[in-house]
Amino acid sequence: MRSLIYRQLLYNSYSVDLSDEITNIGAEKKENVTVQLGEFAQSQYAPVSWGSGETLSGNVEEQTLDGPYAPDSSNLPSNCWYLVNPSNDGVVFSVTDNSTFWMFTYLVLPNTAQTNVTVNVMNETVNISIDNSGSTYRFVDYIKTSSTQAYGSRNYLNTAHRLQAYRRDGDGNISNYWGADTQGDLRVGTYSNPVPNAVINLNADFYVIPDSQQETCTEYIRGGLPAMQTTTYVTPISYAIRSQRIARPNEDIIISKASLWKEVQYNRDIVIRFVFANNIIKAGGLGYKWSEISYKANNYQYTYMRDGVEVVAHTTVSVNGVSVYNYNTGPLPTDFMIRNYDVLKESSFVYVDYWDDSQAFRNMVYVRSLNAELNQVRCEGGHYSFALPVGSWPVMQGGSVILTFDGVTLSTQFTDYVSLNSLRFRFRCAVSEPSFRVTGTRISNLYGLPAANPMGDQQYYEAAGRFSLILLVPSNDDYQTPIANSVTVRQDLERQLDEMRREFNELSANIALSQLIDLALLPLDMFSMFSGIQSTVEAAKTFATSVMKKFRKSDLAKSVNSLTDAITDAAGSISRSSTLRSVNSAASVWTDISDIVDSTDNVVAATATAAAKKFRVKEFTTEFNGVSFDDISAAVVKTKMSKLNVVDEEILPQIITEASEKFIPNRAYRLIDGEKVYEVTTEGKYFAYLTETFEEVVFDAERFAELVTDSPVISAIIDFKTIKNLNDNYGITREQALNMLRSDPKVLRSFINQNNPIIKNRIEQLILQCRI
């Protein structure tokens, strides 16, 4: 026997609904060729050529300096030059950490004779000596390095323009200008006494110059400020607009306007909050194994205040480029295992789709000049305990990444009710301390953020920043641009899928063994599999089509397709009465296994494991009257489907596809060579024994490699250890033994009807492995 349902799915999944395929390909092609690059990006609509509308004819020269600002005392940002322009003599600059560094600068006017002056600086009265016999201004730096010292002059700047500039680098070191602007020895000097968090006191009007424009700052020191520090209009324009406009963090600026359309620049401060979500799926068996710990997309809605107005925001977080790890302590059913778990690493990205109820998102269809700035976000993982039936629970703990803003694009965000045109903020991941580990295992000192508990003790993660964009919107503010994809969206699909998975797994305990074996012997084709779901034939056909579409992307279908076309054709046959087409290229298919004949245990185990993982596919190429693992898998699916309370056409195809991939992960296959049997498992175990006495003999790797290409593969429903245990405790005849080795359904049913505990326990263990 070989399950007919999987054969039909393998065959028909490649030819199902050709019209749907043509439609999909046509849609993709149409999307690629009709999008024309223009001034505006678009989220859904095709671009349209719009005029610029009414535009201003004046050319505006923006001021070079940012300022002037009034005197200030604060922890000014680092990596900027602060150009002071004092109008009077005296202290113009001071800074201290109150521990190891005190500094202030005193402006001495030209032609000042040597004299002593008393100044109040940094809550201290100080007596200093000043002297400037020249005709230029002199900025003198006074420094001390302990509270008991007296201030001494260190460096000075002679300048004709009453300008001095200061800068604090990332380490906190103070730099300013030394020398003289008239003698050509003007230079930048640095005091290597870090004061990273100290308050800087600027006692004069000052300008801010970016660090990248240091040369411009030097020119100002040497040649003075420009003659005019206001906006200059080169060509005459209307007096009504002759006012300097400074972009505010939150405002709407009309760039141009026509009768129907206008361009509006939206500037917004935003607070982005997001919550990671995960899928934690426990595998079948005794409760010691987990099949998947992965990230999944998650929606989050919140409110915050922007300029005194409450903003309702909605975010969707998703990840890309995660690293997938696994861990397995051994082959026993009681050995702890995590088949796959996701970790955010350096190659990973986090996407946060953001929408709020402000005017900026009301007409987000045609967009240009999109820019954004966001701060970093630190994400630290928490604890997750793996609840084992017996023994101490392993705990996954720790892990951290730092998310750095990497770009912004347009996106569409799906909620439970509508789809929203949003902004997608992309964050690049960088690993950070602490590392993560799983207590009681060898998993330790790994870096990244695992998906087990990515939120730690945080309710949400938050990033603050701003964005700016220009939209083409209707001139009438009451009109909202229709969005083509504003339709109801079923975002509860994932939740329903999880609920059906749980219900599907809970039904394993309610399956009668005799009923299961009888069902496994039936020719379960697609119609009989789905006919019990709906009352009409058309509904069953629709259901089967949906399952085939989903099954086409399953790992089993991909494995069949990747081996050879011959195997795919053979697996696709839906005839049970006649023999399947032989695989002419079988030898080439299994060359990678048959070539490995080294007799060492490690290589034999590797060879056996590699063969066992491919035997499921090869099993479809042969016709045998025994029960296969896929027969049991299909029977369990059919039994559980008939017990489900609610069946959804969108959800059940996913469940059936997952069942084909995840049901009975621990399988054993055997090859019979006369009086000798070779048996291998997907867990790396291998046996060779005699059919007469079940005595274990040496595993002949060379002979096994030959049998791989020529002999039929049999599912070891009753594996070697179970048969040996049955023979030792109950005794079985030679005929019963041979039928058991061939997985004869009649013999299995007879032992089950006799309530044989060994056989019943084996079948029950297989059913318990039928979990998703």
Swiss-Prot record:
The record marks 232-233, 242-243 as: Cleavage. Residues 65-225 are annotated as: Spike head. Disulfide bonds: none annotated. InterPro entries: ConA-like_dom_sf, Rota_A_VP4, Rota_VP4_MID, Rota_VP4_MID_sf, VP4_concanavalin-like, VP4_helical. Gene3D superfamilies: 1.20.5.170, 2.60.120.200. Residues 509-772 are annotated as: Spike foot. Residues 247-478 are annotated as: Spike body and stalk (antigen domain). Residues 483-510 form a coiled coil. The keyword Membrane applies. A motif (YGL motif) lies at residues 447-449. One of its GO terms (biological process) is permeabilization of host organelle membrane involved in viral entry into host cell. The record marks 245-246 as: Probable cleavage. Keywords: Capsid protein, Coiled coil, Hemagglutinin, Host cell membrane, Host cytoplasm, Host cytoskeleton, Host endoplasmic reticulum, Host membrane, Host-virus interaction, Membrane, Outer capsid protein, Viral attachment to host cell, Viral penetration into host cytoplasm, Viral penetration via permeabilization of host membrane, Virion, Virus entry into host cell. Residues 388-408 are annotated as: Hydrophobic. Transmembrane segments: none annotated. One of its GO terms (cellular component) is viral outer capsid. It comes from the Viruses. This strain probably does not use sialic acid to attach to the host cell. In group A rotaviruses, VP4 defines the P serotype. HAMAP family: Rota_A_VP4, Rota_VP4. Belongs to the rotavirus VP4 family. This is Outer capsid protein VP4. It comes from Rotavirus A (isolate RVA/Cow/United States/B223/1983/G10P8[11]). The lineage of its organism: Viruses, Riboviria, Orthornavirae, Duplornaviricota, Resentoviricetes.
